[in-house]
Amino acid sequence: MRANSRTECEAERHKIQQAFLDGTSVHATLQALCEMAERNIQESLQASSRAHNLEPEGLAVLAIGGFGRRILFPYSDLDILLLFENGRAEQKLEAVLAELTRTLWDRGFRVSSAARTLDESKQVERENVEFHLSMMDRRFLAGDQTVYQKLEQKVLPRTEKVYRSFLHEELTKLTKRRLAKYGNTIFHLEPNVKDSPGGLRDFHASAWMRQVAGRASEIRGADIVERDLALNAVDFISQVRCFLHYQNGRNDNTLTYELQTIAAEESLGAKDGLKRNAAEWMRIYYRHARTLHHQLQRSLSLQSITAQ
């Protein structure tokens, strides 16, 4: 389908939502939302380039953060990086990018964009560490692929090596600060399934720690069992988060008492399909949350040992 209007985009979103409510897996749901966004970005860039009679030379559009991981929840922001070869390319394509962003907003996408030149990408902004963490999950979407290749092959390998220790320290600080905000416990009566201890952020923080430390592909012995448990937990909590977005009609990740009851009645995420009361269903949630939080605590401990 050529997604060339807000009406068509809304119809596609509704189709994806209905499929989720009818039992389509959360993985397939998030992939469908992601693919829809990618297609619209690519088509919109082509259309805006034609409208201004300019080729997007010197510009690469990258997906970062969750979108970079090929995960897009129903009401999440669309995190993109506009990467320019230099300042001249940025100035030349200013009108093209303004129209690209406007078109995406018109089609119902909540665009969260950042702009950098290749030279600017050589530095890590100390006051904006979260952006650089989101850059770990990056991939090319549209535009000039040679610019992206320069980033991957020439710029970031050196930058990540130079700033590895700093990113280690800042990621640890950010993680501990977030956990402290929620009392360092998974047991909240109405947990935030994204940011609370045991939420999806724990899983991503753990992955970032391994990546920063150069251990992204390490899987040994008991790690295989832990990985499988963590993936099951991510699947369950992702399903809960997707459910919350559709129930609330916005990017609200709080699992309220009312929604706990509805989730339990629907046997959300419970593979046996048995009906449970809210308290019984929440025990399943806490079991999965404990798995993700344990994995994060283990990553924090390993990082502490490495730093000594």
Please annotate each region the language model reported.
Residues 1-308:
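A nucleotide- and high-energy phosphate-metabolite-utilizing enzyme signature
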